[in-house]
Amino acid sequence: MFSIPVSSKTVRLILVSLLLITLINILAAFQRSTLSSWFPSSRHIINKFTDLRLALSSQESVLRDEEGEIYSLVGYHHDFDSNLVVVQKQYLLEKTPNEDTTEHFWNFLQSNFETKSEYDLNLIDGYNYKKLIKHLNEQNELQLSHSFVEQYKMENQFIQSFQNFFVQLIDTIEDCKPDLDPINNDNHYPNGDKIVKYYELRNKIPSENMKQFNIERLIHRNGRIPIYGGHLREQYKDELIRNKEFLSMYLTLSDSEISALKKSHTKFLETMMENWPENLFKFNKFNNFMKGDGIVYLGGGKYNQLVLLSIKILRENGSRLPVEVIIPYKNDYDIQFCDRVLPTLNGKCKLMTDYLPQTFVDKISGFQLKNIALLISSFERILYLDADNIPIRNPDVLFTNAPFTTKHLVVWPDLWRRSTSPHYYTIAGIEVDPNFKVRNSYVDGDERGKYTDSMYYSYHDCKGSIPEASSETGQLLINKKIHFQTLILAMYYNYYGPDYYYPLFSQGAAGEGDKETFIAAAHKLDLPYYQVGEFNREFGPINDNTRKHEFYGMGQYDPIIDYYMSTITTTQKDTKKKINYNSPLPEKYAANDEDDTCSNYDFHLFQSSSLFFLHANWPKYYIEKLFLYSYDEDRGPVTNDGDKRRLYGNELKKELGGYDFELNIMKNLHWCFCEEPLIDLIGIPVVGSKTRTDVCIAIKNHIEFLEIS
């Protein structure tokens, strides 16, 4: 590690000279590179490095942006294989940079760049916490300069305005109720035999051979789409192209049913609110509604233990943005968690039912909770995280860079292909041209993506359709100002989801629920959004029978890096040589999910993708259930046979370049529930009980196992 002794002018001069030589080499290579950066701020990256050179020459250790704010430069991402380099501005709260930060960037520059003739150098913005602190100070001054009575009165007016908002919203939704019976039943999936026959004819399989065929690869529960069908990364060869004809075979609606749903949908679009009610801004003087950025969780009851773990790691990663935990019901409100623990982590609870009319509280169903949480949360721009979602890196930087700054809604993919029924597009009035292919969701080399006959076009590769893949909304970035109507239309979808829209969006596929409502609403309203392209990656032990990875957790990737790699060929039109970040293609593909001769688990869509979130959803970190009862399904850190194992195999550690994130999770679990001061939460064994002691011993044992495995 380099440092510059203040007392030694000679040594300082030598080191500065060496750094200048390195910078000159970097700039020369940068100019030789045929690629200029796509980040708006990095158009001036040469000037920024010149600024750094001048700063160091004049014994200055900081840089200033156009507004005079102090920042340093730190490494954000460096992939040695593709030689993609991303440097981040780090805004400083003090006038001098942290010594570790300075040395970090020094070492970043002193890497092997000078030996590279070409590399792709990019600059991104960091999060300027000074603006956040300024806002907090202004808010505190505002509260100190007004009486309690005035603040209390205005907050009550704000809450009443929110309740009125929901009254109007629910009245509008109920006024547009579809005039037909529910469609989410077996009667609307009558084509099981027809689908099997279709598969037999398409693949020219003799009827005798079909007797050995696993029907569950085509249908489940009479005639629904396979739960785990259409694995996007594995591209199983036996799977049929999901063209319009094939997708239309599952959920079956009559003309009158389609007409009734279309009438309801059209009426809601014509009567839905266009903007937030003015009263919410009239009475938000003393609160943070629609002000700034923040991170939102949906917690309450047993979920609080999951939220606490996630927030603890969030803060450990360096995030400073405020956190809100939305608690659905009063019975779920944990005083210990909300009033004592969360404030120490710059977080607070918000009780959902305070903002809802009582008549609506009794009607809330589980799949509507996320939508409501997004609406009532304080912030204008939100990173929403499920309680069981754990950030691997500091997510604050996502707020200050594309794609979020340009698209205002970022969604991540599920493991599976999209299974949305063509009927949805008819009902929503979205024109899809099945004869016009605008993208190819099959990787190069897959014959299913090469057809020129439109009858073989994947429906969700066609003009007007929502692109692949299906959505996984354990994490979601949304600007509530720009996407207000997205949330309102999604609320309509979720209100009538279980009876109508969930089967239209998923047709029985894995995770059927609210997950498709946000992207569908934005798509219908023609509002901007970005889908992360890198495959969702399952982590877990390898199944002894299928040799495939179990789904213990899902890994999601950095949207900043993803956006760059996915858009580079369209944004760099003037370069002589375009850098292609697509990964080399697999040599072969498995026939189906039971084929143990081949797996493309290590295949990434892009060469330089960076893992960002771990959605630890099965098993969740309910510590008693996980460590003492193996999650009831032999999914714990110790198998039913007594063998210790990593929950996410060695693949998670490999994906993170050797960083043992599972070990870090376990150490934080121990900190949360086994170290002083011991915390009692709903769903956690009582402090001092034998069960609590046994859980902590099991966590400690797993930590020791991970440290040597």
UniProtKB/Swiss-Prot annotation:
GO cellular component: Golgi apparatus; Golgi membrane
Ranges in the topological domain labelled Cytoplasmic: 1-9
Glycosylation (residues): 317
Enzyme Commission number: 2.4.1.-
TM stretches of this protein: 10-30
Any GO MF annotation of the entry: alpha-1,2-mannosyltransferase activity
Origin superkingdom: Eukaryota
GO biological process: mannan biosynthetic process; protein mannosylation
Pathway: Protein modification; protein glycosylation
Keyword Zinc attached: no
Major place of residence: Golgi
Extracellular-facing ranges: 31-709
Compartmental location: Golgi apparatus membrane
Its biological purpose: Alpha-1,2-mannosyltransferase required for cell wall integrity. Responsible for addition of the first alpha-1,2-linked mannose to form the branches on the mannan backbone of oligosaccharides. Addition of alpha-1,2-mannose is required for stabilization of the alpha-1,6-mannose backbone and hence regulates mannan fibril length; and is important for both immune recognition and virulence.
Protein's name according to its UniProt entry: Alpha-1,2-mannosyltransferase MNN24
Biological source species: Candida albicans (strain SC5314 / ATCC MYA-2876) (Yeast)
Gene: MNN24
